Amino acid sequence: MRFMPLFLFAFAALFLPGVAARAAMPAPYTITLKNGKFTPANLSLPANKKIKLTVRNEDAMPAEFESSDLDREQVVAAHDDIIVYLGPLQSGVYNYFDDFNRKITGKITVK
């Protein structure tokens, strides 16, 4: 019985930091470039949250994920992924495109 407080303290010391770390982690989302288009074409994200955005390029050519609205510009090699951290973002629409082929566009709607 006298070891119960020690056990509870040890349990809390091991368990609670993991809970706090998971709560602080950015929410994961993915945009995929395949067959010359982004999917989804319009990604909905929550406002005022940190976001971990994976940009996956399934095409055979490299692409450049670019957005002046988001102030991001990053090359994605063929058949590769990049991670882009965003936010917290305010409500609105944020456009992006492939700078190597500007006809390939998408948008992020934040609500």
Question: Locations of the language-model features?
Answer:
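N-terminal post-signal-peptidase region of extra-cytosolic proteins
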Residues: 34-41, 69-70, 79-84
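C-terminal segment of classical bacterial N-terminal signal peptides
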Residues: 13-21
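N-terminal edge beta-strand
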Residues: 25-48
